[in-house]
């Protein structure tokens, strides 16, 4: 399996910036993060527990704003 070094990571980041643009990077990062989180939940079987916690966190954030 090939190793991914700093130059390869830099090239990937530059390609992502070129394809999506600076303005969309937060949205893309959020979507990737949610996808990884959902994958981990599904693999560990804690999906239902996390949904309840996420809803509670959302309510807390909405109240603080």
UniProtKB/Swiss-Prot annotation:
Superkingdom of the organism of origin: Bacteria
Transmembrane segments: 9-29
GO function term, MF aspect, one: protein transmembrane transporter activity
Keywords noted in UniProt: Cell membrane, Membrane, Protein transport, Translocation, Transmembrane, Transmembrane helix, Transport
GO CC annotations on file: TAT protein transport complex
InterPro entries per the UniProt record, alphabetical: TatA/B/E, TatA/E
PANTHER family documented for this protein: SEC-INDEPENDENT PROTEIN TRANSLOCASE PROTEIN TATA
Family: Belongs to the TatA/E family.
Protein name: Sec-independent protein translocase protein TatA
Native organism: Dehalococcoides mccartyi (strain ATCC BAA-2266 / KCTC 15142 / 195) (Dehalococcoides ethenogenes (strain 195))
Protein encoded by which gene: tatA
């Amino acid at each position: 399996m090939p190793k991914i070094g700093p130059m390869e990571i830099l090239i990937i980041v530059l390609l992502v910036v070129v394809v999506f643009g600076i303005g969309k990077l937060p949205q893309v990062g959020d979507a990737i993060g949610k996808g990884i989180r959902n994958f981990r939940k599904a693999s560990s079987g804690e999906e239902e527990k996390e949904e309840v916690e996420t809803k509670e966190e959302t309510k807390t954030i909405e109240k603080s704003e």
